[in-house]
Regions:
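N-terminal glycine-rich anion-binding loops that anchor highly charged ligand groups
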Residues: 8-13, 40-53
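Active-site-adjacent loop and "lid" segments of alpha/beta metabolic enzymes
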Residues: 3-6, 23-37, 56-78, 85, ...
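Short polar catalytic/cofactor-binding loops
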Residues: 16-20
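Pocket-edge structural micro-motifs
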Residues: 13-14, 212
Length: 288
């Protein structure tokens, strides 16, 4: 299956082969466990598995390329051998090329090629598609750069320029997927504003991937919703199940805005939400 030929909204399942990811750090650091989890996500409806070996959570420190490749290459190889469409989540050109050689068909760079100046040319020389994320700087101080005149307009303009840079590096625009970088260098309010105006980014033409899964701005919204609840549990941080439900809702809204794909931890919840959304739309053509 080519990710470009997917019918309906593609679900990209997340596999973090890291000890420090914000949501599931350490759970899938072992390659066998990571592969087993990835195959479970495929069984639940994931069309692509995104394998990462370096956390991009706020405040995360960079990982040496040698350690990153040690974490991800066995997982990429095993999944590709099983026919799974694999995406490599990396900001390093060396890791990207090694993963593509191991069978990855997509390179997902949250920095859009800014963290490693060699990334665009390196990916252009392969046959892989490229997810170009909106990025204003490293995770260690990303919120210091969250200044926008109009977040949706500014993100669209900045991604347009990165798209032109990718073309200048030799990458056909049809291979590029744009990611608005939800949770990267944006406040909670700016994340919501970007999502509410997602159709403007979609209108640029390239495919758009949206990743909201379990992110802090969802937790904040759920906590606000619980504030009026008199139960003692309302003061606790929202559970993973609640964050996954919130992710599924935002995934449906992204799909309705025209997103090509959504990147999530809980594939089954998002699959079901998208199925209900499709049935709702189809209801207009049903007869009593």
């Amino acid at each position: 299956m080519s990710p470009a030929k997917t019918v309906g909204t593609l679900i990209m399942g997340i596999v973090n082969a890291t000890p420090d990811s914000f949501s599931d750090g350490g759970r899938y650091l072992d390659a066998e466990r990571a592969v087993a989890h990835a195959l479970e996500l495929v069984a639940h409806g994931a069309g692509v598995i995104d394998v990462g070996g370096e956390s991009t959570r706020p405040g995360a420190e960079r990982v040496p390329v040698e350690e990153e490749t040690r974490r991800v290459l066995p997982v990429v190889t095993a999944l590709a051998e099983r026919g799974v469409v694999v995406s490599i989540d990396t900001m390093n050109a060396e890791t990207a090329v090694a993963a593509v050689e191991a069978g990855a068909r997509i390179v997902n760079d949250v920095s859009g090629g800014l963290a490693d100046p060699g990334m665009l040319a390196a990916v252009a020389a392969t046959s892989a598609d490229f997810v170009l994320g909106h990025w204003r700087g490293p995770s260690s101080d990303m919120y210091a750069r969250a200044a926008y005149a109009d977040v949706a307009r500014d993100v669209t303009v900045e991604l347009s320029e990165r798209l032109r840079e990718a073309a200048r590096a030799g990458m056909d625009p049809s291979r590029v997927v744009l990611d608005p970088g939800i949770g990267f260098g944006k406040t909670a309010e700016q994340n919501w504003a970007m999502l509410a105006s997602l159709e403007h980014l979609v209108a640029l033409g390239p495919r758009v991937l949206v990743g909201t899964s379990r992110k802090r701005f969802l937790t904040a919204a759920l906590s606000d919703a619980s504030a009026a609840d008199s139960a003692p549990a309302s003061a606790e941080e929202p559970s993973v199940a609640r964050r996954d439900a919130a992710t599924a809702v935002t995934s449906v809204l992204a799909e309705r805005a025209g997103a090509w794909g959504v990147r999530v931890h809980d594939v089954a919840a998002t699959r079901d939400a998208l199925a209900i959304s499709a049935a709702w739309r189809a209801g207009a053509s049903w007869t009593a």
